[in-house]
Curated annotation (Swiss-Prot):
The lineage of its organism: Bacteria, Pseudomonadati, Pseudomonadota, Alphaproteobacteria, Hyphomicrobiales. Keywords: ATP-binding, Chaperone, Nucleotide-binding, Phosphoprotein, Stress response. Residues 515-529 have a biased composition (Basic and acidic residues). This is Chaperone protein DnaK. Residues 515-535, 600-630 are annotated as: Disordered. Belongs to the heat shock protein 70 family.
Length: 630
């Protein structure tokens, strides 16, 4: 049976794991690393790079390098958070045809789901290379606080990448699975997950194979990227004070500052001070300018203190929803690379009143949990029951623009809930159902997921018709809604598609694009391999021609030289098939040369043997003389 892989699709890095016997195993990528940067780059030559190769060239290609796209997934272009991001990233964020935030590169628009699919394809290929077989099914993780639009967009990304997404699972829940799989005694744990772009806090009761989420809360626009950008702003401001030059308008300089910020942040987790040294960061009439400064851990902590404190309110809300006090939490599990920061650990310790558990790898534990869930769905992992919750309340807009909740936040999923509503006017023959997700009291302050009309209601006084609205949330946290006129039996049912999200036709087109691109990538790789083989063949043939050219006829020599020239011309072109054909031609005409080499080699071997025999005779004579002397 084909394996189900678990993928942690992260803002900064992604990770893939698979069940190996009873344990989840993280798979190394082609560069030998256990995590892959969630970065996609489009080069001037039309090549697409994913992961470490894309990240490596970011400084020289800032506008063509897309990173942290997870922060845009499932978001509208006019979302305030998108506005904030537009000012911080060097690549173009544009309005998609459906009103969502998309990215643009070299005049072509890509949805965040498409970019995410490219990263997922890389993870899929990593797993296939390790397993030696095709992978078609996956469990993909998302932040617990992702809304329906963001979950649906992530599922779409999986489909575009050629994966059947068996389950969308919350990141803290996945981490809890990996942490608690072998724990039999009952515990109440809090999973504090601060990653590259999002923050989640989940409270769970675990024990004897049951993982029950009691509550979850978070912030989908708070993570390591914000810490990096805070440092970038500080570096740029300090440089402006010293040199009078604003680096914020220079995309190349900004990319270098971002890399320096990320490096400084990591170094300050283990040391008290670090030095930022960026020579030739810019230039003016007086010549090149260099950026050199020292940064202490204390200064860094003061710069980001408000970001650290922003994680506390969700923690308070999650405990309140779970009906618990901080002291009733048995263990706090840290997840996400940012939790390596000493200040974060200090704040967590202070809030919960206990040292956090550090026995799991914060970069890998989520992918491992996803792999375990894949094993559960496949039947390989027995006696595990996972009870997750919906992070946000769901409801509809009712008279006066009020948000009427049908399903409260932190309700265990899957779940189904119905409620009967009526008309607001006499003889009203249609109703518009507007579906929202959020916690505000007025509908328009929440996230509009979808709207649809139920028509054909028989004329009647207001308040008489009975319209039954049913919400159904599946195990992925994805919503289906139906409205039914109980008088006529007329029903309208929809699967919520993110307002402005990708239609089935959009997804189908993107799947085709991805397949074509995979074919292009394969063709490009084959072209590179053919070029390498051709250059090696030219080199070896020219070398052999120099050494053994006098052993073949002039005509044969000319044929080989012509074939070499033709192959070199083919290498100047772009057709790998022509290169292959010219290689075969060169190999054919070089056969005589190979024969001459073989004959020369045989003759040399025969001479060597003769020399060896005469040497043996001399040795024998020497031995006999020695014997006589004795």
């Amino acid at each position: 049976m084909a394996k189900v892989i678990g993928i942690d699709l992260g803002t900064t890095n992604s990770c893939v794991a698979v069940m190996d016997g009873k344990n989840a195993k993280v798979i190394e990528n082609s560069e030998g690393a256990r995590t892959t940067p969630s970065v996609v780059a489009f080069t001037d030559g039309g090549e697409r790079l994913v992961g470490q190769p894309a990240k490596r060239q970011a400084v020289t290609n800032p506008e063509g390098t897309i990173f942290a796209v997870k922060r845009l997934i499932g978001r509208r272009f006019d979302d305030p958070m998108v506005e904030k991001d537009k000012a911080l990233v060097p690549y173009k964020i544009v309005k998609g045809d459906n009103g969502d935030a998309w990215v643009e590169e070299a005049g072509k628009k890509y949805s965040p789901s498409q970019i995410s699919a490219m990263i997922l394809q890389k993870m899929k290929e990593t797993a296939e290379s390790y397993l030696g077989e095709k992978v078609e099914q996956a469990v993909i993780t998302v932040p617990a606080y992702f809304n329906d639009a963001q979950r649906q967009a992530t599922k779409d990304a999986g489909k575009i990448a050629g994966l059947e997404v068996l389950r969308i699972i919350n990141e803290p829940t996945a981490a809890a699975l990996a942490y608690g799989l072998d724990k039999k005694d009952g515990k109440t744990i809090a999973v504090y997950d601060l990653g590259g772009g999002t923050f989640d806090i989940s409270v769970l009761e675990i024990g004897d194979g049951v993982f029950e989420v009691k509550s979850t809360n978070g912030d989908t626009f708070l993570g390591g990227e914000d810490f990096d950008m805070r440092l970038v702003g500080y570096f740029a401001d300090e440089f402006k004070k010293e040199q009078g030059i604003d680096l914020k308008n220079d995309k190349l300089a900004l990319q270098r500052l971002k890399e320096a910020a990320e490096k400084a942040k990591i170094e300050l987790s283990s040391s008290q001070q670090t030095e930022i040294n960026l020579p030739f960061i810019t230039a003016d009439q007086s010549g090149p300018k260099h950026l050199t400064m020292k940064l202490t851990r204390a200064k860094f902590e003061s710069l980001v203190d408000d970001l650290v404190q922003r994680t506390i309110e969700p923690c308070k809300a999650a405990l309140k929803d779970a009906g618990l006090k901080a002291g009733e939490i048995d263990e706090v599990v840290l997840v996400g690379g940012m939790t390596r920061m000493p200040k974060i650990q200090e704040v967590v310790q202070s809030f919960f009143g206990k040292d956090p558990h550090k026995g799991v790898n914060p970069d890998e534990v989520v992918a491992m949990g996803a792999a375990i869930q894949g094993g559960v769905l496949q039947g390989d992992v027995k006696d595990v029951l996972l009870l997750d919750v919906t992070p946000l309340s769901l409801g509809i807009e009712t008279l006066g623009g009020v948000f009427t909740r049908l399903i409260e936040r932190n309700t265990t999923i899957p779940t189904k809930k119905s409620q009967v509503f009526s008309t607001a006017d006499d003889n009203q023959n249609a109703v518009t159902i507007r579906v929202f997700q959020g916690e505000r009291e007025m509908a328009n302050d929440n996230k509009l997921l979808a709207q649809f009309d139920l028509v054909g209601i028989p004329p009647a006084p207001r308040g008489v018709p009975q319209i039954e609205v049913t919400f159904d949330i599946d195990a992925n946290g994805i919503v289906n809604v139906s409205a039914k006129d109980k008088g006529t039996g007329k029903e309208h049912q929809i699967r919520i598609q993110a307002s402005g999200g990708l239609s089935d036709a959009d997804i189908e087109k993107m799947v085709k694009d991805a397949e074509e691109h995979a074919a292009e990538d394969k063709k490009r790789r084959e072209g590179v391999e053919a070029r390498n083989q051709a250059e090696a063949l030219i080199h070896s043939t020219e070398k052999s021609l120099t050494e053994y050219g006098d052993k073949i006829s002039t005509e044969e020599k000319e044929q080989i030289e012509t074939a070499i020239s033709d192959l070199k011309s083919a290498l100047d072109g772009t057709d790998p098939e022509e290169v292959t054909a010219k290689m075969q031609k060169l190999a054919e005409v070089s056969m005589k040369l190979g024969q001459a080499m073989y004959e020369a080699s045989q003759a040399a071997t025969a001479n060597t043997e003769t020399d060896t025999k005469s040497d043996d005779v001399v040795d024998a004579d020497f031995e006999e003389i020695s014997d006589k002397k004795k």
